[in-house]
């Protein structure tokens, strides 16, 4: 095996929020048909990659709550890329974790996509964008979004992407109770039991919903007389069963300059939007102690035009 040079590659791996999450129905393959708008935000993890010639994937992290073994999406992504490319190189990977775990912000999916992108460069594989997206879709439904990044329409399981052209500069405040997490699989199951009686087979309805989101999705997110529309079907389930989510949404709704508020993904993180990052920072400065006293961690961030980036 030929030795490669040992550069160190560093990558910024951002979180996402859902600006629209519509569950159209349950498919015959067991997955749910979705129509979503996902947006990267600048709450980010950081990954470092370095070649090792032992043929091993070695993952370390500053987060003690993460498994670092083969069930970690970073390790799965690295092993998939090695197998697909038929190479024997390994990698030493270090993850600096800032995105909370089990929060509805898809930190694990972002890290998986960052690993595919980072190791593609580190190992000089030169795989094209389409190949990386195909590999990503085998690992998780929302991982292809992070290969693309920015703001995207997401259809199917979340793997069918259409780039949106926007220049939103909203500020974001996030709230999450650090002692609460939500199972995405359980949330979808509960939603399906309540609202999806039969398997979905109406292709015309699916296409109509997709067209409506293409035509009107961005309009609903434009600031107009302090009214924005954000839809999250899963919030119907989680808010009723999780007091911390219900309270977080209430607290965000009472912020003076809040334009709108919602839960992200399957929760439990909730967020509020503000006209710009300066307004969001002022609101968080004024309320951070109050949020902490209520049991919430809080963050302020803004939208990103791009997703995963080399640094």
From Swiss-Prot:
Its EC number is 2.7.1.148. It comes from Prochlorococcus marinus (strain MIT 9301). It is an enzyme of class 2 (transferase). One of its GO terms (molecular function) is ATP binding. The active site is at 16, 142. PANTHER family: 4-DIPHOSPHOCYTIDYL-2-C-METHYL-D-ERYTHRITOL KINASE, CHLOROPLASTIC. ATP binds at residues 100-110. This is 4-diphosphocytidyl-2-C-methyl-D-erythritol kinase.
